[in-house]
Design a protein with these regions (language model features):
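Conserved C-terminal active-site "lid" loop/helix of NAD(P)H-dependent oxidoreductases
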Residues: 279-300
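Conserved Rossmann-fold NAD(P)-dependent oxidoreductase catalytic core, especially the SDR/UDP-sugar
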Residues: 60, 70-71, 75, 79-145
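Mid/C-terminal beta-alpha module of Rossmann-like enzyme folds, strongest
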Residues: 228-280, 312-314, 322
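Glycine-rich Rossmann NAD(P)(H)-binding loop
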Residues: 214-217, 245-252, 283, 299
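NAD(P)H-binding glycine-rich loop region in Rossmannoid oxidoreductase-like domains
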Residues: 13-82, 92
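Active-site Tyr-X1-5-Lys
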Residues: 131-172
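Glycine/proline-rich active-site loop of Rossmann-fold NAD(P)-dependent oxidoreductases
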Residues: 168-169, 182-198, 233-245
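Alpha-helical substrate-binding/gating segment
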Residues: 200-245
Length: 322
């Protein structure tokens, strides 16, 4: 957004992150504020009150995505749900000039367990994950993904309910990406801090796929640069108001990712799986379908292809020491 000429106020949870972001964007019209705990009901009141005069747009992108949790309520569900509610309440109370809020949701709020097992199913913005907050609380070690999926679903539903029931003075749009690949931020402190989606690339270049390629996951992906573009255009374009956007470039498999990296990084040959290594392919019965036409047309996205995204991701990881 700074590149588009906006004056940006962003929030982080620690002063260490704030310093890294300031250092990474010298000369930008940028203010970095601290919000240590987004699950507090008044988490964003102070920063919105301080900067709300003249504020036009808000993007809420913060929500935990990982499967290493021990308490789904405090680590996933409440930060996602209360974080979303607290942003919207703060805007409503303290920033009457805000025209639109864009919330980062997820394909997790669209998919269903039955749907992803059905190759005849076509997912679009019309679909909602049936998981509830209570389902998320019941998640255990054998189904950790359900807690994350529930957290994104209830958070996005809360955003739409707020606009519908609370007489909001602003418009809403939501962005629903699946797995997000692409170059990592150069202010990332170390490979240990890599996001969940890109962790597969770290494992790949460190030789962890050499003997067997792991299962791919949900088979739909998008490049982080297209996700950023989707947020910017959903914020600015009149036709985006009041809409969900299923933001995906299409299919991927871990086998395709390995092949792209093997093609472009011959110097990593000894760490990469060769063509005979098993695993990481599409299911024999096929994969569910998707409809990304709304995002393509309304947001005007020319999707970055998988091979380019994979190459750019590995380049950025190698710069961090991978």
């Amino acid at each position: 957004m700074a590149k588009r000429g906006y004056e940006v106020v962003t929030t982080v949870r620690s002063e260490d992150k704030a310093a890294k972001i300031r250092e990474a964007h010298p000369g930008a019209k940028l203010t970095v504020a601290l919000v240590p705990d987004i699950s507090r009901p008044d988490a964003f009141d102070e920063v919105v009150r301080a900067h709300g005069q003249g504020l036009e747009y808000v993007q809420h992108t913060a929500s935990p995505f990982h499967y290493g949790w021990t308490d789904a309520k405090t680590e996933l569900l409440d930060p996602a749900l209360e974080g979303t509610r607290s942003v919207l309440r703060a805007v409503q109370r303290h920033a009457p000039s805000v025209r639109r809020v864009v919330v980062t949701s997820s394909f997790a709020a669209i998919l269903s367990a039955a749907g992803i097992a059905d190759p005849t199913k076509t997912f679009s913005e019309a679909d909602w994950n049936p998981l509830t907050y209570e389902d998320g609380l019941r998640s255990g070690p054998d189904n950790k993904a359900d807690a994350y999926r529930a957290s994104k679903t209830v958070a996005e539903r809360a955003a739409w309910d707020f606009v519908k029931d609370g007489g909001a003075s602003f418009e809403l749009a939501t962005i629903c990406p699946p797995m997000v690949f692409g170059p990592v931020a150069h202010h990332l402190p170390s490979l240990a801090a890599i996001n969940t989606s890109n962790a597969r690339f770290v494992d790949l270049v460190q030789g962890k796929w050499a003997a067997a390629i792991p299962p791919s996951g949900v088979f739909l992906w998008v490049d982080v640069r297209d996700v950023a573009l989707a947020h910017a255009n959903a914020m600015e374009r009149p036709a985006a108001a009041g809409k969900r956007f299923f933001v995906t470039a299409g299919y991927y498999s871990n086998r395709e990712i390995a092949a792209a990296v093997r093609k472009h990084f011959p110097e990593l040959k000894d760490k990469l799986p060769d063509e005979s290594v098993p695993g990481g392919d599409y299911p024999e019965g096929g994969v569910y379908k998707y409809d990304n036409s709304r995002a393509t047309e309304v947001l005007g996205i020319d999707w970055i292809p998988l091979e380019k995204s994979a190459v750019d991701t590995v380049k950025s990881l190698r710069a961090l020491g991978a």
